[in-house]
Each structure stands twice: as structure tokens, then as C-alpha cells.
């Protein structure tokens, strides 16, 4: 069973980390305006493949309980206004913060944060599906969220 509350906790901790390291307002959600903001836009949630290999936990009285599965949260980091020196600088700061903080501690769980490659076609599809113009961004993911 997936602990749904930890996904928001993970994304909140990610936003807090970016806010701390960039000194800029960080918003969780789809980019919607041109204020000086960094957006963390989660666009895909998947069960981590390694979760399928976990044996059920054995609790007293030999009851087998399924392990909590691990989630990978794919997200885009977008700085607005995007195509300005300030926006590009904020985007570079956010990318650097992700690279310098590869592990976030969420309660008693450590999750991995990393940049990721995203095919141009997939990226264009994400923006098109959301009805917003394609712009420069950082593709990243959180591995191990529970």
C-alpha cells in the first residue's frame, strides 16, 4: 500500500530545499504567470521497478503484509520569466541546488533527487497536453518516495 501523504511531503521538502538554496519563491504546480518564481511541476508518477522485488513483510503470527512501494516522481523545474537573464539565472541556481543536494531526508526516509534526461518529443507532449508554450526547463526526478 502506498502512503499517499508522503508524496506531498516529498514535494514540499523539495520546494523548501530549492527555496533555501536559490532565495527565490518556489511554487508547486503548473506554471501559470510571469512573476519571478521557480515552479516545481510534477508531471509523472511511477512505481519504482525495484519495488516489485520486495518480499512481503512478516509481522507477528506469520501474517504477510505487502511492503510499501517506492515511487519515482518526475518533475520539471521552470523559472519565470523564462527567457530573461534573471529567469535563466534562477533556473541554473535550481539545477545546481538539485545537483548539490542529491539526498533529501523526509521523516525517516531518504529520497534521491537527480536531474534526468527527457526526450524532446516527450517534453513537447507534456507542455502541449497542459496547453502552455514549450520553454526552457530542468527535467528531474525524486527516487524512493513512499
Describe each PLM feature range.
Residues 1-58:
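Small/polar-rich, solvent-exposed N-terminal microdomains that initiate assembly or binding
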Residues 6, 63, 82-89:
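Short alpha-helix boundary/capping segments
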Residues 65-82, 92, 134-144:
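Oligomerization/assembly interface segments of phage tail-like spikes and tubes
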Residues 89, 96-146:
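Acidic-leaning, charged glycine-interspersed low-complexity segments
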